[in-house]
């Protein structure tokens, strides 16, 4: 399958004014690429976890006034949804693309997962690549670079996942529009795989 990488014009959809207008641009320019990525990487994750993964392209159906500032495809083991489960994401903000694994506030497994992560805290600190980033709110683009974190910083983020009702924790990479301009399709797909690979052990900890 030939999958086109995201281009600089794809990031520009988030400058389109108006909910209907921006959603039209997203559906035309971004969703076909997310669908193709969904098919390919649902299969990849199923193969590497021995579980059946399904993909879910964000519909932004609850939005009535404000247009979305990001969009994505998510991967989970539930055919009906992903928010209630540990899941993977590939998506775009206006400033960058992202590839994540994580748990968001709807997930009821947060406490158990946080305890599992804390038991393997030193492994997480060592094995997560230095150029990966951590997010504590999927609705905001701000992140913390892994190599800048002390073990205590990571511990606090994980503990927050267990103790704060609305807490979230996601980890992965950001790719700038400039980086995409130098990437071939094959390099982009390889980048997704090389990002998911060190995140698979975190998924396994969620399901031990």
Swiss-Prot record:
Classification via SUPFAM superfamilies: YktB/PF0168-like
Cystine crosslinks: none
UniProt xrefs under InterPro entries: UPF0637, UPF0637_domain_sf
Taxonomy, superkingdom: Bacteria
Pfam families according to UniProt: DUF1054
Similarity comment: family membership: Belongs to the UPF0637 family.
Protein name in UniProt: UPF0637 protein BCG9842_B1177
Native species: Bacillus cereus (strain G9842)
């Amino acid at each position: 399958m030939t999958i086109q990488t995201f281009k600089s014009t794809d990031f520009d959809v988030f400058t389109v004014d108006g909910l209907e207008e921006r959603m039209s641009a997203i559906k035309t320019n971004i969703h076909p690429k997310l669908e193709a990525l969904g098919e390919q990487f649902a299969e990849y994750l199923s193969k590497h976890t021995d579980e059946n993964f399904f993909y879910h392209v964000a519909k932004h159906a609850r939005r009535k006034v404000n247009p979305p500032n990001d969009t994505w495809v998510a991967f989970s083991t539930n055919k009906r949804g992903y928010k209630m489960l540990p899941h993977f994401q590939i998506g775009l903000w206006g400033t960058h693309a992202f590839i994540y694994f994580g748990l968001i506030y709807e997930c009821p497994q947060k406490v158990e997962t946080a305890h599992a992560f804390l038991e393997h805290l030193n492994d997480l600190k060592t094995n997560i690549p230095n150029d990966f980033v951590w997010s504590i709110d999927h609705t905001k683009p701000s992140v913390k670079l892994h190599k800048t974190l002390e073990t205590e910083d990571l511990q606090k983020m994980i503990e927050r996942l267990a103790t704060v009702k609305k807490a979230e924790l996601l980890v992965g990479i950001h790719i700038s529009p400039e980086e995409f301009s130098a990437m071939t399709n094959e390099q982009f797909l390889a980048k997704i795989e090389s990002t998911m690979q060190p995140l698979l052990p975190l998924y396994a900890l969620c399901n031990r």
